Amino acid sequence: MGNHKAALTKQVFTFASELYAYGVREVVISPGSRSTPLALAFEAHPNIKTWIHPDERSAAFFAVGLIKGSERPVAILCTSGTAAANYTPAIAESQISRIPLIVLTSDRPHELRSVGAPQAINQVNMFNNYVSYEFDMPIADDSKETIDAIYYQMQIASQYLYGPHKGPIHFNLPFRDPLTPDLNATELLTSEMKILPHYQKSIDASALRHILNKKKGLIIVGDMQHQEVDQILTYSTIYDLPILADPLSHLRKFDHPNVICTYDLLFRSGLDLKVDFVIRVGKPVISKKLNQWLKKTDAFQILVQNNDKIDVFPIAPDISYEISANDFFRSLMEDTTVNRVSWLEKWQRIEKKGRKEIKCYLEQATDESAFVGELIKKTSEKDALFISNSMPIRDVDNLLLNKNIDVYANRGANGIDGIVSTALGMAVHKRVTLLIGDLSFYHDMNGLLMSKLNNIQMNIVLLNNDGGGIFSYLPQKESATDYFERLFGTPTGLDFEYTAKLYQFDFKRFNNVSEFKNATLLSETSTIYELITNREDNFKQHQILYQKLSEMIHDTL
């Protein structure tokens, strides 16, 4: 028995120390019995912060938020059985978003698998479709090989924590009773750092010269995931190229004349210019209309992504590069005789008129876009905006016009689950305001527990149209009118003031935009600001904006 305890202690303390060595500073633990050895190891490590969350689904998304806020890998730990399955949505989001989430599932020893033992399901390869790397660790014994397995596997897995290969990894760790390590053996807990991998690639610019010497080019920038963007702006300035900047690109914070923000509304309203080439940078953009245009244009498309598994959506490019945006555009710097001034000025002219129409519209609007416009005005440069999927991210895409604020969202799998938890995880490291709809909020209300337990301050702006507002813009609204409200509108009739009381948030309700204009977003007290809106009115007012922009494009071109 003594040998077992010593072997278990050495295994879990070494594992915790190796995670620290590769950059882990935070672990989110969902309590359970089988995870006792590792939970105690993390708790005993002097330089690892532990967070306790009883709901595994919410805990995993909270960790995703910690990663977004700290730009470091974060681990999650749970007990054996169905607890692990609750991690799946956040792992799927992490895989598509290239987020280094380290998934640690405790398991029954091998002799208790597939024999009907309690809390024992097949956990080996259970996230196979969503993780970049996975390994079923050996059971603790007193052999050197068991400890070597930790060193070897962590070294292999570390390539997925940084650089172009980032993504979630999964270690399944079986533990045999008794489960308590020797907490006095703290000399086994180390805080040494490993040399982290560095990735950089160059390109042969001459291979693209015949394309880039054409006149009508565009740079389209999606989610940059913390990459530097200064060379994009430099290249655009030198070579007179418009930049269509997604709100997650962080380029809209720059007051740069080449940054185009209104493109979604412009394409939605009929804009269709002939283009010779497109340089697509980063993740796919939010705008459905821009993605539809990319699918049908005959422009030569270049894709630049700093990861090994490129996201070709919405259409496979003609050529792609696995390289950082800054390295790519730095490699292209050369003399050129192409004069693009008139091409750039055409885009700048349309952008200027588009912004004017949007501002005029917002001065009179009373729909959700008016609330979103006011929120953007109220958000300071010190705050980050975390935007829920569905309608909120689309309104921000349309209405955020060059303001120095950082915008974040879960745009990997684009789900509405885990939004509150992700934003709260970010709020540990940044001042965050969350913009979210009522159904997304309902989906993750239990995530608010982390704010209550850990005094994490965050403001929540809740757009409440009592249902799924985005479905009003889809064909089923007209083709399935008899069933629309029940199947798609899905009203809940919930009073979220009770949610605020349950989790000790302040609560303020606004029935119109005028009331919200006079409100102040507090920075010291966590508050839910509920904005009451109407789905049908919201749809009708958006159509008015589209029509105004359509008329502007017709008159301008």
UniProtKB/Swiss-Prot annotation:
- Biological processes per GO annotation: menaquinone biosynthetic process
SUPFAM superfamilies recorded? Thiamin diphosphate-binding fold (THDP-binding) (SSF52518)
Protein name as it appears in the record: 2-succinyl-5-enolpyruvyl-6-hydroxy-3-cyclohexene-1-carboxylate synthase
Family, according to the entry, reads as follows:
Belongs to the TPP enzyme family. MenD subfamily.
* Record's catalysed reaction(s): isochorismate + 2-oxoglutarate + H(+) = 5-enolpyruvoyl-6-hydroxy-2-succinyl-cyclohex-3-ene-1-carboxylate + CO2
Q: In which pathway does it act?
A: Quinol/quinone metabolism; 1,4-dihydroxy-2-naphthoate biosynthesis; 1,4-dihydroxy-2-naphthoate from chorismate: step 2/7; Quinol/quinone metabolism; menaquinone biosynthesis
**Which PANTHER family does the entry link to?**
2-SUCCINYL-5-ENOLPYRUVYL-6-HYDROXY-3-CYCLOHEXENE-1-CARBOXYLATE SYNTHASE, PROTEIN PHYLLO, CHLOROPLASTIC
| Assembly description | Homodimer.
Cofactor(s) annotated in UniProt: Mg(2+); Mn(2+); thiamine diphosphate
Supply the alphabetized keyword list: Magnesium, Manganese, Menaquinone biosynthesis, Metal-binding, Thiamine pyrophosphate, Transferase
Entry keyword annotation includes Oxidoreductase:
no
**HAMAP family for this protein:** MenD (MF_01659)
Record InterPro entries:
MenaQ_synth_MenD, MenD_middle, THDP-binding, Thiamin_PyroP_enz_TPP-bd_dom, TPP_enzyme_TPP-bd
Q: Name one GO molecular function term.
A: manganese ion binding
